[in-house]
Regions:
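Extracellular/oxidizing-compartment recognition motifs
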Residues: 1-180
Length: 180
């Protein structure tokens, strides 16, 4: 769900507002879940080629529906934007029982870009941690220890990608970051 109010000023200095309403078209997204710290779940099979290009035919899409207004008050997000400021390559890659372990040689925060030629429906998990426990990434030192989240430790600092299986696929999480 979303509501959009885009205000802009044209070259002549006149202000304009574009607001979303029931005339807008909508379709399901390949982004199934996102959380600033928990990670993303992205299904590449649901991608719609060209959806964000001029002239895309969205006539098969549904019209947007008015949803109940959320409770609470709107607040401006004060978090700094997540920008690419550096790209790192791993200093080592080790095969483990559960997959591969990538060591970047430093403690940092960011996201990993996945480039893969996977099989249709193949599910790939990218787990992040700042140190190892029993040879696997451990998140005990970087998750928010709250009682009601204890059951969700499995999902902390993890991105999940499901492959389309049609050649090289590239996935970079857009709405999260991790310590590793």
């Amino acid at each position: 769900q979303m509501a959009l109010c885009l205000t802009y000023t044209d070259k002549s200095g006149e202000a304009h507002c574009i607001e979303s309403d029931e005339t807008w078209r909508t379709e399901s997204s390949p982004l199934l879940f996102d959380d600033y710290r928990f990670g993303e779940i992205y299904d590449g099979r649901l991608e719609i080629p060209g959806w964000n290009t001029i002239g895309f035919d969205d006539s098969a899409w549904k019209f947007a529906e008015r949803a109940p207004q959320p409770r609470g008050e709107k607040r401006l997000c004060t978090a700094e934007p997540i920008d690419i400021v550096n790209e790192l390559k791993p200093i080592s890659v080790t095969k483990t029982e559960k997959g591969y372990l990538y060591d970047f040689g430093i403690n940092t925060a960011g996201v990993c870009r996945l480039c893969v030629r996977g099989e249709l429906d193949q599910r790939i998990e990218l787990r992040h941690g700042e140190h190892l426990k029993d040879g696997l990434p451990d998140v005990e030192n970087i998750w928010f220890k709250r009682e009601h989240w204890a059951r969700d430790l499995e999902y902390v600092h993890k991105d999940v990608y499901t492959c389309r299986g049609d050649g090289e696929e590239v996935y970079t999480p857009a709405f999260t970051y991790h310590g590793f």
